[in-house]
Amino acid sequence: LLAHEVGTGKTLTMISAAFKMKELGLIHKPLFVVPSSLTAQFGQEIMRFYPTKKVFVTTEQDFEKSRRRLFVSRILTSDYDGIVIGHSQFEKVRVSQEREQAFISEKIDELDEIISYAKANDDKITFKQAQSMRRSLEANLETLLENKTGIDEFINFESLGIDMLFVDEAHGYKNVRPMTR
């Protein structure tokens, strides 16, 4: 987490960290997720400091239905030093159905433990909260299993071979709901 003031070099720090890790063989295909309005600017920053690096800066057009196969094949077959993608584009790249199913099932199991604990300790508020969250997750799981999501499954995160994720303005992704009392 880079939480420095504006103008203190977070972008360059992120870029430099990625390329050093790649140079050391720790990673092979880093993905930079940046605000959609800044993808081109971020790509320019990379070229300013690392002009010899091969970087794929995505555009909205790369995610049009007619171009998705080309987009995926470019990432899979080219040896990019980095890939830059906007937040709105990144949100279109789902994890596989199997991974999402496993994640939801794990959360349901965790809630079952919380429900058992709350029931044993007569904690009605926590019990009701956990039951509500569990019902919501079960509905999500059912929708997923019935493949009613309406989402194009052609692109999934695992298929891209990304092994390091750098997220600029990551606060937009921190809305995981913890179970609190």
Q: Language model features by range: what are they?
A:
Residues 1-3:
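Conserved pre-motif I regulatory segment
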Residues 8-13, 17-166, 174-176, 180-181:
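SF2 helicase/translocase NTPase motor core
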